């Protein structure tokens, strides 16, 4: 039997620009901003520390908090600012030009990040509620803080 290679789309609980905390992996405990979300891979790319809010819950960056820079819902991944940094060796493009080493944020699976409240410095799960006007918004379960304006 062949494996099903079609990508599975997962609903991500984080969006680009959210602040998250890493809850697993080598960056556990870091806080950063989500740069990019990869829903197909169920991963996120996180950037920076103590900027917005998402907490990483697994992996080498476990515990780090950062802002979600990019959400990739087709891959179920996100990119968080300053978290899961990888080095890439780039060959020279032209003769006489030297090669270089570039550092960039790699995607993290969305299940390894939690939304983070910068006001109360606590990571929390998300629930959905409706405002008085009938608009559906995201809310942190622990703090009751509304995320979407």
UniProtKB/Swiss-Prot annotation:
SMART domains: KOW. SUPFAM superfamilies: Translation proteins SH3-like domain. Keywords: Ribonucleoprotein, Ribosomal protein, RNA-binding, rRNA-binding. Pfam families: KOW, ribosomal_L24. InterPro entries: KOW, Rib_uL2_dom2, Ribosomal_uL24, Ribosomal_uL24_CS, Ribosomal_uL24_KOW, Translation_prot_SH3-like_sf. GO terms for cellular component: ribonucleoprotein complex; ribosome. The keyword Hydrolase does not apply. GO terms for biological process: translation. CDD domains: KOW_RPL26 (cd06089). GO terms for molecular function: rRNA binding; structural constituent of ribosome. It comes from the Bacteria. Belongs to the universal ribosomal protein uL24 family. Part of the 50S ribosomal subunit. One of two assembly initiator proteins, it binds directly to the 5'-end of the 23S rRNA, where it nucleates assembly of the 50S subunit. This is Large ribosomal subunit protein uL24. It comes from Nostoc sp. (strain PCC 7120 / SAG 25.82 / UTEX 2576).
């Amino acid at each position: 039997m062949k494996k099903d290679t079609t990508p599975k789309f997962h609903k991500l609980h984080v969006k680009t620009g959210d602040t998250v905390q890493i809850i697993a992996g080598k960056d556990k405990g870091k806080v950063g901003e989500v740069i990019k979300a990869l829903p197909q891979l169920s991963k996120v790319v996180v950037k920076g520390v103590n900027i917005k809010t998402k907490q990483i819950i697994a992996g080498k960056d476990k515990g780090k908090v950062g802002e979600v820079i990019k959400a990739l819902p087709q891959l179920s991944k996100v990119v968080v600012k300053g978290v899961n940094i990888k080095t890439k060796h780039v060959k020279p493009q032209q003769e006489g030009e030297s090669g270089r080493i570039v550092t960039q944020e790699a995607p993290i699976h969305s299940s390894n990040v939690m939304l983070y409240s910068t006001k109360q410095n606590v990571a929390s799960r998300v629930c959905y509620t409706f405002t008085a006007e009938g608009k559906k918004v995201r809310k942190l379960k622990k703090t009751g803080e509304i995320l979407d304006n």
